[in-house]
Amino acid sequence: MGLSDMARTMATADVLRRCLDRWQDWQLATPLDSPPKMGALIAQGSGHSVYGIASTPQLIGRIRHQSTRLTDEAFSQELIIWSLAAQNGLAPRIVYADEKEQAVICERADTAAQAASGEALGTLCRRIYALPGVSHQLTLASDIEHYLKRLPAHLADPWRAAMHAGNAETALAALAADTLYLCHNDLTPGNLMSHGDQLIAIDWEYAAMGSRYFDVAIACEALPDSERGIMMRQVFGDALDDELMTAGKQIAGLVTALWQCCFAIDEAPSPAEWLGSSGY
């Protein structure tokens, strides 16, 4: 562990300890009768550190250690949608949140025993799309521009050229004109958990009103080819729009690639690879 990693771990642990000190404010069905203790670091992603908490019921603490958010309001917006999803059995229930520190204590969900099937993932999507709408929308064009501006010119310029060659603006316009639904927009394998025999989602950071075709395309990226068609049929049935699905796949691949360029450069494809996967 490097010095910066150690400092980051110490800082997030300090934030969690302050949350633990507020244990009597936690919203639990049965209040704790003694102070909880901080457990081990369970996971560390690009933006969050996740710690176990020694308590009954089993809880975890999610602490932000690096900003990957696109707006200042993103955390409060995430809490609104996360709470809504939890009320409908689609996410772990939040028991405490500190908006200043961007820290959350929530119920601990189980890691899925096996990779989600297309049918299970499609069912989860349909249940999310049935939730009431919220006020904020996914802004794909400005999000893409945000990522491009984070990159040095020698990286950003080839991406802009590839976007132009691939007619990304046309795909973005098609998605922007689609009917809006509440979407998770980041249903990647690491954000899928289980509660009993049901698939649920964590990390609602990018959730907003948007096109289901972008959301499904993001979720499909990790599925085997044989499961992708099953998922699409589960969500859209006979109403599947092939042109919108193509646009969703193209922009999902672009957003994922640019996010990787900013936060996980070793995983990022080249602009030419993205263009090739888009059929150009």
Which residues fall in each region the model found?
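ATP-binding pocket architecture of kinase catalytic cores
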Residues: 40-139
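Active-site acidic catalytic loop and adjacent metal/ATP-binding pocket
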Residues: 40-61, 170-214
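Phosphate/pyrophosphate-binding loops and the adjoining catalytic core of nucleotide-dependent enzymes
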Residues: 2-19
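Hydrophobic packing residues in well-ordered alpha-helices of helical domains and bundles
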Residues: 75, 121, 161-165, 245, ...
